[in-house]
């Protein structure tokens, strides 16, 4: 399994069990599902065995987003102005990270991130925002939106702000 970690905060953001897809060579999109969990349950992306199916209804059951729940992502809020201020600082941090670690990616990141940021701004009202578990204000803010069907949630992670760790 590969864990996708934020290069700034080192928070776990996702894993390959959720089949991230690269979009525009600048972000990962991860389709999510709404699941029901009882207090204390953790979903790591594996399919439960049919033999382990639980019967009955528990009053402590909540409906949650599987990726948000599994990686303990924390909901946060932005207005457009504060998000753009955050994004400018975050992009600078990622550019510095790339300059030190992957200098060949800096140009691709700058072009792709600028174009994708315009898409975000154009559809700003459609997004919910999530930080990693540590809630590091300098770390990645993942974006949650819904597919055209209006019911399938998906998360967006900045590709260049992710490092892959095999476990």
From Swiss-Prot:
Keywords from the UniProt entry: Cytoplasm, Cytoskeleton, Microtubule, Protein biosynthesis
SUPFAM superfamilies, per the entry: Mss4-like
Subcellular location: Cytoplasm, Cytoskeleton
Source superkingdom: Eukaryota
Listed Gene3D superfamilies: Metal Binding Protein, Guanine Nucleotide Exchange Factor, Chain A
GO cellular component, one term: cytoplasm
A GO MF label: calcium ion binding
Domain TCTP: 1-167
PROSITE patterns reported for this sequence: TCTP_1, TCTP_2, TCTP_3
Keyword Transmembrane helix belongs to the record: no
InterPro entries xref list: Mss4-like_sf, Mss4/transl-control_tumour, TCTP, Translation_control_tumour_CS, Translational_control_tumour_p
GO annotation terms (biological process): translation
PANTHER family assigned: TRANSLATIONALLY CONTROLLED TUMOR PROTEIN-RELATED (PTHR11991), TRANSLATIONALLY-CONTROLLED TUMOR PROTEIN (PTHR11991:SF0)
Family per similarity comment: Belongs to the TCTP family.
Its job: Involved in protein synthesis. Involved in microtubule stabilization.
Protein name: Translationally-controlled tumor protein homolog
Organism lineage string: Eukaryota, Fungi, Dikarya, Ascomycota, Saccharomycotina
